[in-house]
Amino acid sequence: MNSYDPQDTGSQQEETVALKGHFYGVYLLCSQSLDPRYRGKCYVGFTVNPKRRIRQHNLGCDFGGARKTSRKGPWLMVMIVHGFPNNTVALQFEWAWQQPSLSTRLKMYPELKRKLPRETFFDYNFRILSHMLGVGPWNRLPLTVRWLETDYERPFSKTLPNHMEIVSGKVSISASQRRRPDDAVPPPPVAWASECHLCMQQIEQPEKSRLGCTNQMCRLTCHMVCLANYLLGDETGHYIPVGGECPLCETRLSWAALLQRKRLLMGVPEELQDHDEDLSDDIDVDSDIEDGAQELSN
């Protein structure tokens, strides 16, 4: 799934719409400053809204940008990794990308501790990312690596897990999936069974514990735990599956797609619809990559 050729225009996507409140991204900035002290320096950060975040960085810390990027741009957001299940996991990924020599998962790789001679800051950060995507727990996450600037696109030196995607194109955040044209036909209601197809027990609190197949013609109804255990099969040491086949219709399932469908069926919480600006990007945004951070702040 993740085979990707930067010259292949078929892999280009102009825009992907993500639902507000369900997008968590970790991005890489590259400075385009004319000042040689800053040009080419990089910055890793977390965001729930990429368009707004790059605007804040380029306006400066007085407008919500990070202190360490203020007056050292303009900045380009060249790539973003998204598909994290929540902001906690995304922030942990951000911190490890920023601090590979301190991360429990990465510090055993001495080659990641410092930038190599003649290696650009972008190449160094890209090398760290390549390692991260092949290391647990991140190698089991249904992540998408999205190139935002074509001039920086390049193939990964290491093969990524098959369930990860590498794409190109901008991201926009939709305020609500319920915003449809007045004449749009609403989707048909989902026909749920009252019992789990796997354990045959009644599903209590279905809004929290029920999952179904992504195939709209399939009537699979399961406890979340039951379906997770089924998809894991004989795989030991894990609690969350990557994917597998539907036990009813044999459709190939992605665990991330199952959870996304569940969120869409539940709708967007009112607090997320009304307070987009409260979805702060500012947690840990003032920390930098360890190597080069001192140079960037001078």
Swiss-Prot record:
Pfam families: GIY-YIG, SLX1_C. Its cofactor is a divalent metal cation. Residues 275-298 are annotated as: Disordered. It comes from the Eukaryota. Its main location: nucleus. SMART domains: GIYc. Forms a heterodimer with mus312/SLX4. Catalytic subunit of a heterodimeric structure-specific endonuclease that resolves DNA secondary structures generated during DNA repair and recombination. Has endonuclease activity towards branched DNA substrates, introducing single-strand cuts in duplex DNA close to junctions with ss-DNA. This is Structure-specific endonuclease subunit SLX1 homolog. It comes from Drosophila sechellia (Fruit fly).
